[in-house]
């Protein structure tokens, strides 16, 4: 039976205080609970020692602070780069995957925003089986907290990328609440500039996100410089073609001042030619705003026959962009030996 208790992690601090008032509980206790959840990061209401026993009992009867449970049989650490991939189980039994990537500048957690995905991008494992449902703010937050527990010793998460399973902007309201909670200075206090949200191009929601005027990083899953090619990779492009997507990106930059990153998965003999690199350079230069391109060599997925180009081809593509004054990086492959691409572990376990 699904648990219908109120998840306290679905609430901002203000909402938590309002909830306590409606329940007739002392409002200042809400801040103490917030501290226990995000500073102390406890797993149980019962251990909240500065909360009166009677209130703790009422909280346990009416509320929950655990929105997912770690599947201890599905935690994998890459011996080559330290990437950690783990699966968690939601209250309704649905699996959700999370990835921790280790860098010199800190630990980054890649969280899922949906269980599965409806976008049907042809190169992505997340779309296998479609979308089961959106994740709640608490279910997204618990992935971050679970990552802190999975990390060894005193290590913790420094950066968040919402690039796991699902299209974050399709789960817009829950995403915004998640962002506000993890950014709260009385909680996890992760700065917006340490958070990246990736979208395959839901144009109306990009405009909505621009109006929020958050200082987060926006990444666009572009993967092709023209509609003919992008239509074959991302079905959503038939609804919101590239020119509409890029117009929304310009508005986002004007509102926030934040440079946008364009992600480009390089697929051998499909979108990796020098002519396409030149076309991409022209398209991005015409935006007349700061941009960055993140080239991603295709990470093998069983569901497709795509492969990554040879390193020389990747270098040629990168060099062409750089010669046109486009900032570019090549993402280092991480977690290949632990099903590191989004959706891979969940898809394998579901089978």
UniProtKB/Swiss-Prot annotation:
The active site is at 97 (proton acceptor), 342 (s-methylcysteine intermediate). It is found in: Cytoplasm. One of its GO terms (biological process) is tRNA methylation. Disulfide bonds join 110-342. GO terms for cellular component: cytoplasm. It comes from Natranaerobius thermophilus (strain ATCC BAA-1301 / DSM 18059 / JW/NM-WN-LF). Its EC number is 2.1.1.192. Its cofactor is [4Fe-4S] cluster. The keyword Cytoplasm applies. This is Probable dual-specificity RNA methyltransferase RlmN. Belongs to the radical SAM superfamily. RlmN family.
